[in-house]
């Protein structure tokens, strides 16, 4: 019960955060496929989704993958897109427009059920948000056609300095800055990613690694944008630091960014992404 209670609390917190940050996330990242969002094309290529397919976009967010699926499946295909954030779905609906064969559903991925059987399921940058990913994956498997394909993308564990430069430093001042449950980077290697999917009963697993580049601008732009767009729970923790602590933290983060800083003062980060495909057999 303790784990279930922790999972429920985490899910509620995640929904609240995404309802808050979805507009910024869409504008800065998803809408223009910035940095790691360049992986969307790779994910769809690896999915081998065809015209007339029936597809489920799991944790669709603000609709980046969903929007591209419309052309992939054509007018005779069908797309269901689910997410737990009402704010994200609202943006996705507006962005994708009035498409007759596309349906958005606000739902819990552990419990959602469709009478439809899917040829393919896509999930970009969301698996790590599920506190019980096995429950989600097994639920997805039940709704897939035999020999159907699931395709997922996650951030790498070791080569994503955009996050690490700040988070490694912040945790020295605020050890509980991020929730310890679930671990957000637990699928960030080919081995751990494959193992999770295999444990859910999938087979013919293929994982590919891609490295993208992303520039947040100068250090000041990187630092100020991070602070500006913190979700409420993180902002409260960050603001609990003294002025002196914040100044020290800023310098620690700046030191970590130096190896990625070009002569013109702009930071260019590498960003590792893993994409996995597997079969329901």
Residue ranges: model-predicted function:
Residues 2-51, 64-68, 88-91, 95, ...:
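Conserved class I S-adenosyl-L-methionine
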Residues 3-10, 14, 28, 33-37, ...:
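Conserved Class I S-adenosyl-L-methionine
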Residues 47-49, 73, 96, 144, ...:
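A generic alpha-to-beta junction signature in SAM-dependent methyltransferases
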Residues 52, 75-76, 144-149:
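Short glycine-dipeptide loop
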Residues 54-112, 135:
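Class I SAM-dependent methyltransferase SAM/SAH-binding core
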Residues 110-121:
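A short acidic, Gly/Pro-enriched loop at the edge of an enzyme's catalytic core
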Residues 119-133, 156:
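A short SAM/SAH-binding and catalytic strip from SAM-dependent methyltransferases
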Residues 134-135, 149-217, 263:
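Conserved catalytic/acceptor-binding region of the Class I
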